[in-house]
Design a protein with these regions (language model features):
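Small-residue-enriched alpha-helical segments and adjacent helix-cap loops
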Residues: 2-133, 139
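Short cysteine/histidine-rich zinc-coordinating motifs and their immediately flanking basic loops
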Residues: 84-86, 124-128, 151-163
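Hydrophobic face of beta-strands forming the core of extended beta-sheets/solenoids
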Residues: 135, 164-165
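Iron-sulfur cluster-binding cysteine motifs and their immediate structural context
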Residues: 145-162, 168-177
């Protein structure tokens, strides 16, 4: 089924459960790509299944050489480490590219921070959120919290100035949260 960024509404979940009971064997499979499958549906019932799912705003997914379900972690909306709105980006990519035919299957994966829970590099096009930090003297109160928060040791504090070592920074954003 088409699941954008791993998000389904309660209405969609209820309809999927209803269809699984009526046309399948009463269970669903949650795929590794954040989608849902209803196994054991008879081929001659596919049109009825699609119609029933549409009543709950659920659309079929795709297979074969096409752009697949866009996966995303929960991003900044829920995760304290999140740096970007992963769901908004997933919806945008889905609207532009979902089911587009290509020479081979194609997967998007969006992760909101450097924790990389979605393993963005394992997708054909992976997006990893981050924050590029610049020190502004007029905004700094010299408290040292940013230096302590930086796990990669990219931030140093000397002679009243903060330096962000770009080669060490992993763009996690902990220093500004």
């Amino acid at each position: 089924l088409r699941v954008v960024g791993g998000n389904l509404t309660a209405k969609q979940l209820a309809k999927i459960a209803e269809v699984a009971e009526k046309f399948g064997d009463g269970h669903v499979h949650l795929t590794s790509r954040q989608s849902v499958e209803i196994p054991f549906v008879k081929l001659e019932q596919i049109d009825a299944v699609k119609a029933a799912l549409a009543e709950g705003d659920v659309e079929p997914g795709v297979c074969g050489p096409r752009v697949r379900t866009v996966t995303a972690c929960q991003g900044e909306a829920i995760c304290p480490s999140g740096c970007i709105d992963t769901y908004a980006l997933a919806k945008e990519l889905d609207a532009r590219y979902f089911a587009r035919e290509l020479p081979h299957k194609f997967k998007f994966g969006i992760t909101g921070c450097q924790n990389n829970c979605l393993k963005s590099e394992e997708n054909d096009w992976g997006i990893k959120g981050g924050i590029q930090v610049k020190w502004r003297e007029e905004d700094c109160i010299q408290c040292g919290v940013c230096t302590k928060a930086c796990r990669s040791g990219a931030i140093t504090h000397e002679d009243g100035k903060i330096t962000v070592g770009e080669s060490k920074c992993n763009f996690c954003g902990r220093c500004v949260k």
